[in-house]
């Protein structure tokens, strides 16, 4: 294995990245654009293959296999970016004082360390929930690909962004889909209920059974294949597959064991540095200014800023107003800014095929917006009006 390059002081010059998801690979690309020679090592528990994670919400309608999602193998990515890749190598711990990462394949020294450990799919607190399908990675899809392709009756637990995308995608392929959420409407963390009504209508028009204000009380494996699912109102149904899409939980175990400050995520400052010197965090695992930002655009901007910082030019992360896109083809949505809050006054324009909803503060300033259906072209003009 290639040894780490040492500085004159005997400290490794290597930038070591733990993880191989979008954040890790985007950081590698950003570093390479700025410096063709900087030693970089990426350690990952999987193969390190590059794929497009948002495609996971649409694999059924596209008939896409897990293998076909791979854009570039880990070894090809490493060769292309001229980095040292250590695949299939779980990390056991971090020693910040010695600047050492301990793994199943031995110890690796670092000059700067980046935690890009991502987040894991949350599961309901129920017996047997570990057997539910989650689709948070290519590996998870590969493990469940057979049951997903064969299932006719599918229950999706969670009507957030991913849950709605999955439900519509699977229904468009002729599956019998039930969408369950404790909230009274879909996308409840993003939208007022009234603005989700066209999306609800679009889901129903594709045959999705919407069960809001309800959770799952019990999941029982059936003889042979399938599940008997009991909702919190006592009703039961037979399902071939149950998918949990109730959010993400940042992977914090390594950071906690190393003594780094954590809350919901790994706490970072504006330079994305953790509470320990020479250790940074990026992506779904990081908590910046009190926020978790599990979206692609802030990760790209974070990777660009962090690359400059790691190469000697301190660059604080600043985020402009950013679009969140809900890829539900029968009724797509885009939103940005602040779209939840009792203090917001909404100005809405509806037609039979779309909506433009503007959220304004008491002084009339635009705070956020939602566009839906055939009104997508209104998104960017409104985005430019949001305060930066």
Swiss-Prot record:
Gene Ontology molecular-function annotations: oxidoreductase activity, acting on iron-sulfur proteins as donors, NAD or NADP as acceptor
Q: Which reaction does it catalyse?
A: 2 reduced [nitric oxide reductase rubredoxin domain] + NAD(+) + H(+) = 2 oxidized [nitric oxide reductase rubredoxin domain] + NADH
Checking PANTHER family in the record gives: NITRITE REDUCTASE [NAD(P)H], PYRIDINE NUCLEOTIDE-DISULFIDE OXIDOREDUCTASE DOMAIN-CONTAINING
Q: What family, per the record?
A: Belongs to the FAD-dependent oxidoreductase family.
* Keyword list, A-Z: Cytoplasm, FAD, Flavoprotein, NAD, Oxidoreductase
The pathway to which it is assigned is: Nitrogen metabolism; nitric oxide reduction
Task: Please explain the role this protein plays, according to its UniProt record.
Answer: One of at least two accessory proteins for anaerobic nitric oxide (NO) reductase. Reduces the rubredoxin moiety of NO reductase.
Concerning Gene3D superfamilies, the annotation shows: 3.30.390.120, FAD/NAD(P)-binding domain
Q: Which InterPro entries match?
A: FAD-bd_OxRdtase (IPR050260), FAD/NAD-bd_sf (IPR036188), FAD/NAD-binding_dom (IPR023753), NO_rdtase_NorW (IPR023961), Rbx-bd (IPR041364)
Record-level GO cellular component terms: cytoplasm
Q: What class of enzyme is it?
A: oxidoreductase
> Gene behind this chain?
norW
* Cofactors, names only: FAD
What Enzyme Commission number does this protein have?
Answer: 1.18.1.-
This protein is called what? Nitric oxide reductase FlRd-NAD(+) reductase
Where in or outside the cell it occurs: the entry states: Cytoplasm
Instruction: Provide an example Pfam family for this protein.
Output: Rbx_binding
